[in-house]
Amino acid sequence: MTLVDELIKGLLPENEEKTVAIYAGGFKPPTRGHFEVVKQALEEHPNIDELLIYIGKKERDGITQAQSLLVWEIYANYLPLKVELIPTSTPPIKAVYNYAKNNPETSVLWIIGAREGDDGDFKDIADRTKNVDNYSNIALAVTITTNTASGTAARNAAKISMEKLKPLLPDELKDEEVIQVFDIIKENTAPNHVVESKAILNWEKRVTIPGPVPPAFLEGDVLTYEG
């Protein structure tokens, strides 16, 4: 049992359940959007005694669990002490179910973020929570935000510059903390490579290649694109 658990246990009446909120995901890396989900969830559910952030192990585009934890630790400077960061080797969704199973007397509030107007997010939520009815002590709490920052966008921004990354980070961060986050993220994110094709094209003509290849740019007579 953690120190937070001991303190909460002493404050709760004997017959009152503890409410533990869980926010689980990959967070590769954590963004402004993830941070706002936590803040908003705490505001919308003042009965939360403890909020656990489960950080998944799976690496994404060079960003590791350790890097994600380091970034969250910076964000935690602006979150209450009831927030606890937990790296997990178990897939995040399974970790939520495991916690509920192992703590049947605890009321578990499963925090899930969704971007306003993003139908894909709501479909994803339905897929991820299809087994939730098997756990009587889990209640879903979908937190809808207007921020569209994603881990993918942050990874791509970090490949370009700190200036591109900054708008995807919490406004609360000091300048030196923005630098710290950028340094953490860029460590394993390689910059986009310029790939040449043998196609000979007209000078300064911008083209788009059908299929998955990004918009192309010309250098001299050789087609190049960022991949």
Locations of regions flagged by a protein language model:
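Nucleotidyltransferase catalytic core that binds NTPs
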Residues: T2-G227
